[in-house]
Curated annotation (Swiss-Prot):
Keywords: Capsid protein, Host nucleus, Host-virus interaction, Viral genome packaging, Viral penetration into host nucleus, Viral release from host cell, Virion, Virus entry into host cell. Its main location: virion. This is Capsid vertex component 2. InterPro entries: Herpes_UL25. The gene is CVC2.
Amino acid sequence: MWPVGSSYTRACSVQRWPKRCVYWAPSPQNVLEINPHRFQESRRSAALYRKHVVESKLNLIKKELLKAELDNVVQTNLANSQAITDYLTTLEDLANILVDRAQQPASSNQGGARPQTDPHVPQPAPAIPSAPPKENTTTVVIAPGDSGYTFSTNFLREFLSGLYATSASWLPSYGPWFTAMTANAMQRRVFPKELKGTANLKNSTSLKLITEVLTTVASINVDFYTDLRNLSDFNAALCILNAYYCKTQGHPLPASREELLDNLGPKIAALVADIKGLGSDSNITFTFTFSSGQQAATIAPVNGDGRYNKDFFSNHKIFRLLVAKEVVLLPNFTNVPGATDGPDYIYALTSALFSDNIPPFGNYQLNLRSGIKGVEYLILVYLTLANAQLSKPDGRRLHLKALLGAAFEHSSKVQLFKRDEVFTFLMKEYVLPILSHNNNISTTELFPGMALAALEVGNQINFDPNKHFVNLAGTKFTKIFNVLNQKLMFKDVRELLVAKSELRVALENGLAATLNSIAPVNAVVEVIQKQFGGGDDYDRLYFLVLGCLPVTVAVV
């Protein structure tokens, strides 16, 4: 017989569920009721909220972009107003001086005889009216022996506008590529009306159309990000080339931005020679490795930390060489103990010559990507002009005397140029003045012709070279036209960024296709000759700078 006390103790120690847990206890009496109307209403409310959040973010982005654009317009108008005010002030001073001079003889005649002056006493010199302030201009020279070109804001735009000064007698024609582009643009239903001028129907291309197309091509590598950490692809490429040359050759780092361009030809040649020494591994090319379709369609890293995936640069020849020479310091890509403890030459250049806000390229890899592609761009420009001879007009298309009139002068002296001499001249007389005018310029703004040539080579690799046919689809112009449509018609900021990113990725693919070919220089020369009419080194030099080779066509 159990003791009464122990039974009572066990009964009291039995654990009981709290009342709030009764509803969750398994029981056939528990029923879950879902009101379909409330469920649909909740889904609708959630969708509306998500749509509201997305629209709020888009409106905020548009407001910021509009604010920046309006600020630029205000600054431009303020500068123009200040210039007009200065001119008016100068004119007023000149008018007052002339009035005072006119009144002095009259007052002296009314007073009788002129006062006697001592000839030995020095008299004050007459006041000389100050000349009006000169407009801020820049002068560049493209080819040795040619006249220089003076421009105020944009060299390409001002050069193109000068070609249409005598449009009543003749118009410029730009070659097969631009003829096909113009015809394709005129046949499109969705295309800006302001670009469909009457000149497009006279075996020519209107000023507005050629200007917008070449401006779009020239702005491909212009960063549309507003981050202070960004560096233009041209400046990033200069930093990489100089850091590589100083690291491998033992030279001191440049002390100014102008010194970055000194001996740029030998610096590129040293890098090209080392690239050729890497061997012929089919897996190591000039292309990046994309881990997702989203990253393949954008320029900036998809990851939020400013870095690409680990294997993004791994199969790129220039990156492999930079890591092997310890110019780019990334711990994940080197097996040398203590290699990352050495000096970062690239960071030393960017922090000393540009800004302290620019982080090392290994941490902010957008600059590394744009810099590597900028190096590819400059390599192609250098190789195209390395052995250029400009004195032999064999099959030359461009005759600037007929285009520009008596203002243009060309030396008829026969001159033989050494290797790299034309390229060095171009860096000194063309790139350096423009760089002092705009220190954040991109490679495509300097050499839009190379962008067109690379895009054309990239389009050609998609077709079978053994099959000869004429491409009538005009798809190679689509990416350029998409940017024009979004910029001038739809004006959707988000879609404009997408269109610009697609065009820049296409240029990267074109540069890679050109450098991966058996003879990159021959590929560029062939495209310039067949698509744009370039016949000799003189034509190719001007095509790289202008992006076109105009000739005169009579108006009928």
